[in-house]
Amino acid sequence: MVKSAPGYLFCMSQSSSELQNSALEIFSRLNSQQSEAVKETDRPLLIIAGAGSGKTLTVASKIAYLIASGVPPEHILALTFNQKAAEELKVRVTEMLKCPADLNISTFHSFCNQVIHDNILNTKLNANFKVITETAQLVYLAKNINSFGLEHLAFNHKPYTLAEEMKKFISRCKDEFVTPQDLQLYLEEHQKLSLDEEATEDLNNLKDILKIYQAYEAYKLQNNLLDFGDMLCIVHNLLKSKPIVLQSYQEKFQFVIVDEFQDTNYIQLQIVNLIAKKHGHITVVGDDDQSIYRFRGAHLTNIAEFKKTFPNFTEKTLGHNYRSTKKIVATANTLIENSPERTIKQLFTNNPPGNQIEVIETPNDTSQANYIVEITKNLLKTYQPQDIAILCRRRASAEPILNAFRKHALSFNFVGQTGFFQEPIIKDITAFLNILNNPIESNVEIVRILNRPNYGIKQVDIYKFTSYAKQTGLSFYETFDHLNKIAVDKLKFPIVKQTLTDLLNKKNRLRTIDLIHTILFEQEFYKYEVALKNTRNLQLLNQFYTFAEEFNNIYPDSDLEAFTDYLTYASNFEIEEKNDTEQAVIISTIHGVKGMQYPVVIIPDVNDRKIPATYQKDKFAIPKKLLKGIQSTYDDKELHTQEERRLFYVAITRAKEKLVITYANRHGENKTGSKPSRFLQEINYQQNPHIAFQQITSPEILIELTNTENQTKTKLLQQLIVNLTTGQFNDAIETVLLFAKITNKNLNIQTDIIKKIKEPNYTQLEQITTKKPLTVPSDHVFSVSQFVSYQKCPRQYHYRYVMKIPEKPRYYFEFGTTIHNIAEKLTRLQKEKQPVNEIIAEELLAKFWSSKSYQSELDEKRDYAEAKNILKNFLEEQNKSKTEILDIERWFEIAVGNVRIRGRIDRIDRDKTGYTVIDYKTSKTASSLNELKKDMQLLVYALAVKEIYGSTSQLKVGDWFLRPNKQVFFTPEIQAIENIQTEIHVMSKKINSAVFDPKKDAWNCRECDYACLCD
C-alpha cells in the first residue's frame, strides 16, 4: 500500500476528496488485468503487456494513481523509449489528475543529460558539451581512417563501410559498458596464449579496433563532445563512484517506472537498478514478443536480469487487445507461437472479426509497387492518407514503392534512413555552397543553378552558355563575364551572375551557418516552396539547416571549405529523414513505427531474404568474455531469425482494421526467383481461414500511361507559381495555355475576360484566397511562447510553428543563456541547502562558458568580467531574500477553457503572504511595470500557479533583470487575467482556422527573420 507523504497534497487547488475521486475515475477506465497492475505498489512489478493491450493507459494510470494516493510527483521517475511516448504519458497523466503536476517523464538520454547537468561540478565535463550526431561520428571515422595507424584491418579502399562497422562496434561497447581499458586488458591476456589462425586474426583486428576506439574517445574529449552512449556511462559511473549522488537520486526517485523494458540495454538496466534497489518500488513494462532492437544492444535477457535483481517481484500480464480485429489477432498469435523461450501469453480481443487478411503474390517488385499504389488509391476513397501505413523491412524494399508514389503524385511521409543528400533540393543547396567554395571548378554546379526554376532560364539559353564556355576554354563562372558575346536572355543571366558575386562577397564576412541561412532565404528556396505549399521540400530544407547547425555546434570556427568537405563525406551515408506531413500516407521501416497503430497496414516484400533478412555475422564482435549480463543459449543466427519473426509480428500488430501482405516472385534483374517468407508458411497463408490469398499474374500490372502526363502537369503547375511569384505574367499566361492543352481543354482569352480583371473585384479576390480551415488536433498543447509569437504577428507564427522554418542564429543569446543557466543552478543548490558562494559561482561560470560566439578576445574578456559581476550581485540579492525557494524550473500544463497550454516557470518562492513567480531575464535594460502588467507570459504563469497551489492571499509575478540587477513585480488584476484568457481563446480559434495574416509594423517587420518570405 502506498504511504502518503505527511501533510502532502500535490495540487492545492484540489481537495483530498477530489483527488480520491480522480483515483476512482482512473479505475473506471481499466479492465481487471490493468487494475491489478496499477494497484500493485508494494513490490517490484513486471508487466508483460501484449500488443494493443492498453500499455500506455496502464502506465499513465499507475503514475496518476501513485500521485492521487499521496506520492509527490517529484518522487516518481518514468523512463520511456522515445520523446513522443514521454509527451503522450505527460498529457494522459495530467488529464487524469485534472491538475498540472511536475512530472519526471523522459527518455533515458534526456534523463541522463539532466543528471549530468545537475551534477556538472562532480564531473570533468564543461557544461557546454555537445552531443555528437551519428552522421558526425561516421564522418570523423571515415575521414580519419588513414590516420589511426591500422596494421591489420583491411578495408579495401572502402572507408565508409569500415566507418559504419566501427561506429556500430563502439556503440555496442557503450551499451555493454566495455571501455577501451577493458579491451586493452583482454588483448594483454590473450597475447600470451597459443591461438589458432582464426583467433589470431580476430585478436589482431581487435588491436586495430582499439586504436580507432581510443582515437575516437580522444577526439570527443578534445572537442567537448559526448555521444549517447557516453551519457549513460557517465551517469552510471557517477552513481557508482559518488555515494552521496546515488543516495540523493534514490531518495528523490522512490518510485521508478520503465516503459518498453524489452528494448533496454545492459547499461540502462544498471542505472535503473542502482536508483531503484533501495526502495524496491520499481515497475517495468514490456513485451518479449516485441523485442526488436538487438542491433542496438537491447537485451531480451533483461527480463531475466530483472527477476534476478528483484527476486521478490510479482508479474502481471495484459493480454486483452483493444486495437485489432479478431482475424488479425489470431494470425499474430499463430506467428509468434513459433518463438521459443517466450513468456506464454495469448492475445485475445472482443473486437469484431473484421475483413480477411489479404496476402498477394505478384510477378515482380515493379508490379508489386504498382499494385500497392492502386490499392492505396482505392483505400483513399474511404480512409484519410495518414490512416494508411506501408511498412518495409528495409529502405531497399521501400524504394520501388516510393518511386511509384512519386510517379502517381501521391503524397507520402517516409520514416527511416534515406538518401537525404540525393534529394534534388538538397543537391541545389550543395551546388550553391560548392560554387562559393571554388567557383572556377564548379561547372556542373553552375548548370544546376541555372536550371533553378526561380530564374526561369530556358534550356536553349543554357546550352548556348555552356557551348560558348567549351569553345573558349573558359570555366562556366568566367563565362558570366562574356554574356554580351552570347545570344542568351540578357535579363536573367546577369541576375545569376550578380547573385553569385554578392554571395562570394558575403562568404568572406559571414560565418558559415549565417551564409547557409542567407542562401536558403535570399535565393528563394523557402519562398518558392512556401508558394508551392510543398511541405516535403520545406521539411528537407529545415532538416538541412539543422544538419548545418549541428556541424556549427561541433566545429564553430570552421569555414565554408570545411563544411563542404564535411558534406562530401556525409553524403556517403544514409541519415534519418524527419518528415511529419500530416495529410500523407506513411511509408516506413518497421522499426520506425514501433508503438504506433494504423487503421490500414500494408507489408510488402514478405519474401525470404527480405523478411527474415539474410543473416550476416558481425564483422567485428565484442569478445564474449567481456559481455555482461545473462547471455542467451542460442547462437547468433538463430537469435537473428527469432528477432526477424518478432519484427514481422510488430508489423502485423500495428493494423487495426485492414492488413495487406504482399510478396514478389522476382526482384530487379535477378533471374532466380524469390521465395515467399517462411513466416508466411508459419501462418499457413494459403489455407488459413483468416487469410484471403490471391495471385496476380500480369507482370506489368497497373502501369498507367498517364505517368508522363501527371509529371508534366506537376511541372507546369510549379512553373506557373514561379511565373506568378517572380512577376513573369506573360510567361504565366503561356504556362496556363500549355496546361490547358495537355488537359484537352480549349482556352480562349476573350476581351470580356480582360475587361473583367481591369478593375479587380476585391470581394471576389477575398473569396478566392480564403484559406481552407486547418483543424488543430484535439490533443494539441500550445506553449506560452507560441501565443506570444501569434500575438506579435500571425504570419510569423505560421512560418515558425506551422512550417517550422528556422530563425536566424543569434550568438548574443548565448551570454544570456549562460547567465540564466548558472542562476538556475545556484538557486537549486540553495534550495537543497548546499553551500553557495562566489567561488562556486565562478566554478559554474567556467563550466558553462563558451568562447565560440566570440571573434574578439577583448570582447570575450569584457563579457566574462560582466558575467562574474552579475553573478556576484545575484548572490548578494539572494542572500538578502527572506522567501523560501519552493520550486525551480516548474513544469505546468493547464487548460484555459478547451485550450491546453504548457510551459516552465523559472522559479516560485513563498513567504507568509503568498507566492512569488520569478522569471529571470538577461536583457540590458529592465521593462517598466506597465509593460509587465500586459505581459502574456507572466499572466499565464499566474494562472498556472493559482491552479497548482489554489487561491492565495497574495500572488506576485514579475521579472528579475539580472544584468541591471532590478526586480519588477506586481499582483495581477483579475480583469487582466480574464482578458488574457479571452485573448487565448480568440487566438486559438484563429490558429485553428488558419488565420495567419501579417501584422504590419515597421520595426517588427524590419527585425523579422521571415521578412523576405512575406509580401
PLM region descriptions:
Residues 3-91, 202, 244, 251, ...:
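Conserved motor-region signature of P-loop NTPase helicases/translocases
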Residues 8-24, 42-43, 50-53, 64-233, ...:
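A basic/glycine-biased coupling hinge at the interface between accessory DNA-binding modules
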Residues 12, 24, 583, 600, ...:
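Accessory/regulatory regions of helicases
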Residues 104-114, 257-260, 285, 394-396, ...:
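Conserved helicase core region in the C-terminal RecA-like lobe
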Residues 203-210, 215-216, 225, 384, ...:
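Accessory C-terminal helicase-associated subdomains
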Residues 593, 644-659, 821, 827, ...:
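Metal-dependent nuclease catalytic cores in nucleic-acid-processing enzymes
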Residues 595, 689-714, 839, 945-1015:
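Metal-dependent nuclease catalytic regions and adjoining charged, substrate-binding loops involved
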Residues 887-948, 970, 980-984:
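Non-catalytic protein-protein interaction segments used by genome-maintenance enzymes to assemble
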